[in-house]
């Protein structure tokens, strides 16, 4: 099974349980690091901070279900956490949600001589995002984005 399909299947299995426990699933990823596999789920609660106890509640519920369903054939570690203040932006839904906020975008390759941009997310369009940086609007094609993060406000 392809990784993208596995992640989609895992999201379909996990999202209802996360929701049942009173949280929203922000993002899910299945990665291999140093010869170990990790299933990482990032949860949130609108207008509330996520505590260690929140992560524990969701982790236990997911662990029980994943043991029964057994969707992952490899040995792996389950990690549940908050996306954090400087959360990664993965989808149009994430970008749209944070219009008007400060973001940092790293590029896959140079864009107008720049490797990245930090500024206010102004708009999200089908193939690009628009970031205002130092009074200029910079159009960033989505296929040029390597990473995008919200710049946290404390």
Swiss-Prot record:
InterPro entries: Ribosome_maturation_RimP (IPR003728), RimP_C (IPR028998), RimP_C_sf (IPR036847), RimP_N (IPR028989), RimP_N_sf (IPR035956)
Gene3D superfamilies per the UniProt record, alphabetical: Ribosome maturation factor RimP, C-terminal domain (2.30.30.180), RimP-like superfamily, N-terminal (3.30.300.70)
Gene Ontology terms: cellular component: cytosol
Predominant cellular place of this UniProt entry's protein: cytoplasm
CDD domains per record: YlxS_C (cd01734)
The protein, known as: Ribosome maturation factor RimP
Domain of life where this protein originates: Bacteria
HAMAP family in the cross-refs: RimP
Keywords associated with the record: Cytoplasm, Ribosome biogenesis
Species this protein is from: Clostridium perfringens (strain SM101 / Type A)
Pfam families recorded: DUF150_C (PF17384), RimP_N (PF02576)
Xref: NCBIfam families: PRK00092.3-1
Function summary: Required for maturation of 30S ribosomal subunits.
Signal peptide span: none
Keyword Cytoplasm: yes
Family per record: Belongs to the RimP family.
Location in the cell: Cytoplasm
GO biological process: ribosomal small subunit assembly; translation
PANTHER family: RIBOSOME MATURATION FACTOR RIMP
UniProt key word Cytoplasm: yes
Taxonomy of the source species: Bacteria, Bacillati, Bacillota, Clostridia, Eubacteriales
């Amino acid at each position: 099974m392809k990784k993208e399909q596995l992640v989609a299947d895992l999201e379909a299995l996990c999202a209802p349980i996360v929701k049942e426990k009173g949280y929203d699933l922000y993002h899910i990823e299945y990665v291999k690091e140093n010869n170990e596999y990790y299933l990482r789920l990032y949860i949130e609660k609108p207008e509330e901070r996520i505590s260690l106890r929140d992560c524990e509640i969701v982790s236990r519920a997911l662990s029980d279900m994943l043991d029964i369903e057994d969707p992952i054939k490899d040995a792996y570690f389950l990690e549940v956490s908050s996306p954090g203040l400087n959360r990664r932006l993965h989808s149009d839904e994430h970008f749209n949600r944070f219009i008007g906020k400060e973001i940092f975008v790293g590029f896959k390759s140079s864009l107008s001589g720049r490797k990245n941009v930090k500024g206010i997310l102004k708009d999200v369009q089908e193939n690009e995002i628009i970031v205002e940086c130092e009074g200029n609007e910079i159009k960033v094609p989505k296929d040029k984005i390597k990473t995008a993060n919200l710049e946290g406000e404390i």
